[in-house]
């Protein structure tokens, strides 16, 4: 008999839930994906098919823009540096910022799972209780005096919320979108970390090369000062000429500490990026010769870019969440129906539990319909405003992404031309310095002309190194601007 009642109650709850779901509707608008950017290119002026080339110059090769080329998930490997590859992999494994992003993603996923478990399925709870009580019949005008008895109960309660108007489902949509947002944030953090390590390694190589170039110039200037001192001792030149050359020497020497400081700070940055303390890290030393310049670089069309950039995808996830929250706000104006059933046993002894005459049960259905609640309309309006803000933020993220790509593409094109010009300037400055030094030693030119030639040679050499490094960092920035290829791991 008790078993039959269990089946009856269980079937009643499941059938009621099934009937409720069959008649469910989901209030609020269904999400519609925004249109892709309706533009063919990133800049008003068409890009050349490839960048300028500087023959005979390291990192001076031409780069070809390949339309539609997929971005590799390990795009940093295109620079051909095993040291860089190892450092980035170390950072991806050990970075605390990535660990925090991963934990936040797990939190969002578990929030969704918790809500799904309580919204989609009936809740089943078991209870077991024991009571010992004394009563005094004389207090009720009855004979018999006091009476002590035990009461035991055990039972199961099943409850279910009929989501007739989809409020729970919209809430799940919002939580799923929030989990997606955190997933895209994690992917964005990975790409940012890889990009920061790559550009920091390239900056380290740049500063090291500029220090080396400056030290070479410093050595040449020291030789000129030594010669000038001998000539002054012999009375061939005035003391002022010697002091002018010495001033130039010390000015060149003074430019070294700032470069060393930049190099050291870059090493500290690299240590933190790979999850180590600056004082305990062993950071590899990079040179510009450690890197190769990719000959082919990807160029996605704008309509595909929005799918590839994690920041744009994260912004769209927030838009989906806002759309779902709008549906949740609307659903609060509709009836809420809750069903519950209880089956149990109550007896004066444990041996009598679930015996004849001990079974108790209940069936309950509750309907709540808001009749007057001034806050509901305001809640809907608030959710609508939140959706409008999310839509505007999404459009802004798309525009920022397009601008980012446009800036990097122009930087690549102009950077190649800059290197070409800097290489020519450096060749001319070095040739001029050699000629001026020879003529100065022969007495044909003044020390002022020598100083000018030295200054030009120093500055053009430093600028040349910066232009070489800039081609590397601009290329890394393009890979990031194109989304970093993170979807390659998904697909």
Language-model-detected regions and their locations in the chain:
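A short glycine-centered flexible hinge/capping loop motif at secondary-structure junctions
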Residues: 232-236, 440-444, 481-485
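Periplasmic alpha-helical coiled-coil/stalk elements that build and connect Gram-negative outer-membrane
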Residues: 168, 177, 184-301, 411, ...
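Sec/SRP-type N-terminal targeting helices
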Residues: 99-100, 162-190, 240, 244, ...
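Terminal intrinsically disordered/low-complexity segments used for targeting and assembly
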Residues: 2-93, 152, 176, 260-307, ...
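Transmembrane beta-barrel architecture of outer-membrane proteins
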Residues: 26, 84-86, 151-153, 199, ...
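Membrane-embedded beta-strand positions in outer-membrane beta-barrel channels/transporters
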Residues: 88, 153-157, 201, 302, ...
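Small/polar, glycine/serine/threonine/aspartate-rich low-complexity segments that form flexible
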Residues: 63-79, 130-157, 280-298, 327, ...
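Outer membrane beta-barrel translocator domains of Type V secretion systems
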Residues: 123-161, 167-178, 182-184
């Amino acid at each position: 008999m008790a078993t039959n009642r269990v089946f009856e109650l269980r079937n009643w709850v499941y059938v009621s839930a099934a009937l409720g779901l069959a008649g469910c509707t989901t209030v609020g608008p269904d999400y519609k994906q925004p249109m892709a950017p309706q533009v063919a290119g990133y800049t008003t002026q068409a890009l050349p098919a490839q960048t300028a080339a500087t023959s005979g110059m390291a990192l001076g090769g031409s780069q070809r823009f390949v339309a539609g080329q997929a971005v590799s998930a390990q795009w940093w490997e295109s620079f051909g540096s095993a040291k860089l590859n190892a450092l980035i992999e170390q950072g991806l494994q050990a970075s605390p910022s990535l660990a925090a992003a991963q934990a936040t993603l797990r939190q969002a996923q578990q929030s969704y799972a918790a809500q799904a478990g309580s919204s989609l399925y009936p809740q089943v709870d078991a209870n077991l209780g024991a009571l010992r009580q004394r009563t005094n019949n004389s207090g009720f005008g009855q004979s018999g005096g006091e009476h002590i008895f035990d009461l035991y109960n055990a039972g199961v309660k099943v409850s279910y919320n009929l989501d007739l108007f989809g409020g729970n489902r919209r809430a799940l949509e919002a939580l799923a979108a929030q989990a997606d947002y955190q997933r895209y944030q994690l992917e964005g953090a990975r790409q940012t970390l890889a990009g920061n390590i790559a550009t920091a390694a390239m900056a380290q190589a740049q500063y090291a090369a500029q220090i080396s170039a400056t030290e070479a110039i410093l050595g040449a200037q020291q030789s000129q000062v030594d010669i000038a001192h001998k000539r002054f001792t012999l009375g061939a030149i005035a003391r002022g000429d010697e002091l002018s050359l010495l001033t130039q020497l010390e000015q060149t020497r003074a430019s070294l500490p700032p470069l060393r400081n930049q190099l050291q700070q870059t090493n500290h940055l690299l240590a933190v990026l790979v999850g180590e303390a600056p004082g305990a890290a062993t950071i590899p030393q990079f040179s510009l010769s450690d890197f190769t310049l990719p000959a082919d670089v990807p160029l996605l069309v704008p309509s595909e870019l929005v799918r590839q950039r994690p920041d744009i995808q994260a912004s769209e996830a927030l838009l989906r969440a806002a759309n779902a929250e709008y549906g949740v706000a609307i659903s609060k104006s509709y009836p809420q129906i809750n069903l519950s059933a209880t089956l149990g046993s109550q007896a004066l002894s444990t041996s009598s539990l679930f015996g004849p005459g001990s079974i108790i049960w209940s069936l309950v259905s509750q309907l709540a319909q808001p009749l007057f609640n001034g806050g509901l309309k305001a809640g809907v309006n608030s959710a609508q405003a939140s959706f409008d803000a999310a839509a505007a933020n999404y459009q802004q993220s798309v525009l920022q992404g397009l601008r980012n790509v446009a800036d990097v593409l122009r930087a690549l094109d102009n950077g190649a031309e800059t290197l070409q010009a800097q290489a020519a300037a450096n060749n001319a400055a070095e040739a001029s310095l050699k000629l001026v030094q020879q003529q100065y030693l022969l007495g044909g030119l003044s020390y002022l002309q020598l100083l000018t030639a030295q200054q030009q040679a120093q500055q053009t050499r430093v600028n040349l190194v910066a232009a070489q490094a800039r081609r590397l960092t601009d290329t890394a920035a393009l890979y990031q601007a194109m989304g970093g290829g993170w979807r390659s791991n998904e697909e």
